[in-house]
From Swiss-Prot:
Protein name (database record): UDP-N-acetylenolpyruvoylglucosamine reductase
Record's function text: Cell wall formation.
Origin organism lineage: Bacteria, Bacillati, Bacillota, Bacilli, Bacillales
Signal sequence annotation: none
Catalysed reaction, written as an equation: UDP-N-acetyl-alpha-D-muramate + NADP(+) = UDP-N-acetyl-3-O-(1-carboxyvinyl)-alpha-D-glucosamine + NADPH + H(+)
Amino acid sequence: MHKDDILKELKKVLPEEIIKVDEPLKRYTYTQTGGNADFYLSPTTNEQVQAINHLARMNNIPVTYLGNGSNIIIREGGIRGIVLSLLSMDYIKVEDNVIIAGSGAAIIDVSRKARDYSLTGLEFACGIPGSIGGAVFMNAGAYGGEVRDCIEHAVCVNERGEIVTLTRDELELGYRSSIVQKQHLVVLEASFNLAPGNQEEIQSVMDDLTNRRETKQPLEYPSCGSVFQRPPGHFAGKLIQDSELQGHRIGGVEVSKKHAGFMVNVDNGTATDYEDLIHHVQNVVKEKFDVELHPEVRIIGDHPEEHQ
């Protein structure tokens, strides 16, 4: 379908105010890089998500789901078809010891809400800069905790546009992986089963984790968070540090001098700079230690030369 025809079809099923055409995606990524989306849609209801999925499936339009852009690199060529953002679905509800959060809610905010209600179990998430949808997608974790530890179930949309509810076991949450990734599901909502706790003790744990994060991580620059998964028996940051790569720079992106597991945008870096630096680090670590580093960050979109 031509873009004008797609736009006409979108306007039949969605309010115009949630449709953006040729939208710069660097506005929505922590790295501040990325080309344009043909269509950037920000639905506010499950029904709108289903309508978008149905329209896309019937017309063979690719759909890319975007969380809050914290652990993703989008290439300068942008993304064809539809980019679907669920950030407007950011509600947080508390029912007894269960917190229910929309896909677009920041997991930091959900962690704070748990604290406010003296519920323990989400302290580990107090510094994770991601949305609930993204956190479930990759089983986000930090400081010894992860989503798998406390999630009860997630409500998702499958590729056929059907709404399904998956239990913790059915989500198959592993190290930075889930069935959501494997089956191309879209998380609409997640419920977390927490335990009653002492609010002061919960706050104390969160303060400690926040201090550790601020002390060790390069929060003063744009970045995509931890770049590589932890290889078995090793720490990615230690391997990179021992390869003397801290401070190594390609274009405007460098391996952080503060934490070797991060790459920071210090001077108008591009997605290409990030990708080239990632490949360079992988090659050096492989050569020095014979260890394969696999990206934790998602790299998506067209290369610039594909969209000229």
